[in-house]
């Protein structure tokens, strides 16, 4: 019931066989659909899976979500926090070099326990509390300057526009290295930088010269409005938190809003892991530090502008 022409189209990718045809072919040749479609020589039935120790496919886990992938970031962060773990540096380095698999995962969990139970070095000279009352107790005194309500709207609008404009300026070249960015800017007559980088700057000849993929980026001369970006999403998300919970919102409210309003891939590094922690049932404040090597990265510092807007 299958013509030669149909098979040729399937082989070349011109068309895809209907499910009924696939079933007919598998029956005709006496092979299972698993073998035919997935290349498996043995069919795995549901009953087998019930008693199997199922493992994740570690290579498919994003590095930000795999604690072991950031184990040297954990070491650096922990030593910056004054934790006495230098004697384990060789262990951290050895685990870091392992392939991305179950063994690396298990050993990283052992190192995490070492970090959790480590003492602060006696010679550590900094005081870095996490509790708000303790932070306030250590801060310097400062005088509050009264703001003119007439100017606030214009200032807040300017701050929001500044964030958008600056974000768009960097969006076109996020991740590029200076040894490629500077030659590129010189070649496009934009060095020192005095205007936005344009799509019209990116010719095929220019793009072939660099490892950075300029062709796939977003540019101001091909858009009508600001595209979504994590560096602007959080400001909008903060507004939604206040709209839904008022000024007396709690960390738990924030976790619920994060899960509700954005998918996982909208978050990066520390925020990505915190999101995954919410999903797994870890709640604030533990969710902000549990298996997060990136916990003191710049993300939190650059997400707080909205709270300044509404508390002038």
Predicted regions and their residues:
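Recognition helix of helix-turn-helix/homeodomain-like DNA-binding domains
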Residues: 2-16, 38
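Acidic active-site catalytic centers that drive phospho-/nucleotidyl reactions
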Residues: 11, 34, 230
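Short amphipathic alpha-helical surface patches that mediate protein-protein
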Residues: 12, 38-42, 256-259, 263
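DNA major-groove recognition helix of helix-turn-helix/homeodomain DNA-binding modules
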Residues: 20-35
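Charged, helix-prone or intrinsically disordered regulatory segments positioned adjacent to compact structured domains
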Residues: 33-52
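Structured, active/binding-site neighborhoods that engage oxygen-rich ligands
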Residues: 48-312
């Amino acid at each position: 019931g299958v013509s030669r022409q149909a098979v040729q189209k399937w082989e070349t990718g011109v068309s895809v066989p209907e499910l009924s045809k696939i079933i007919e072919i598998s029956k005709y040749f006496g092979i299972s659909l698993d073998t035919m479609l997935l290349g498996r020589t043995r069919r795995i039935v549901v009953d087998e899976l019930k008693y199997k120790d199922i493992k994740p496919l570690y290579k498919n886990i994003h590095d930000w979500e795999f604690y072991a992938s950031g184990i040297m970031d954990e070491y650096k962060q922990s030593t910056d926090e004054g934790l006495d773990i230098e004697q384990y540096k060789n262990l951290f380095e050895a685990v870091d070099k392992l392939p991305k698999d179950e063994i690396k995962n298990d050993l990283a969990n052992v190192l995490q326990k070492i970090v959790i139970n480590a003492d602060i070095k006696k010679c550590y000279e900094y005081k870095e509390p996490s509790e708000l009352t303790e932070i306030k107790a250590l801060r310097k005194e400062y005088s509050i300057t009264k703001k003119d309500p007439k100017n606030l709207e214009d200032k807040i609008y300017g701050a929001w526009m500044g964030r958008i404009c600056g974000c768009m300026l960097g969006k076109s070249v996020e991740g590029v290295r200076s040894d490629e960015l500077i030659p590129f800017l010189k070649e496009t007559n934009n060095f020192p930088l005095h205007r936005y980088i344009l799509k019209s700057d990116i010719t095929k000849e220019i793009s072939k010269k660099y490892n950075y993929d300029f062709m796939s980026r977003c540019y101001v001369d091909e858009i009508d409005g600001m595209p979504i970006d994590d560096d602007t999403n959080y400001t909008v998300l903060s507004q939604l938190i206040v709209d839904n919970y008022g000024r007396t919102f709690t960390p738990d409210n924030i976790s619920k809003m994060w899960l509700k309003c954005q998918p996982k891939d909208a978050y990066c590094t520390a925020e990505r892991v915190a999101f995954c922690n919410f999903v797994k049932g870890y709640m604030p404040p533990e969710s902000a530090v549990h298996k997060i090597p990136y916990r003191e990265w710049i993300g939190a510092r650059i997400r707080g502008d909205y709270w300044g807007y509404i508390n002038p």
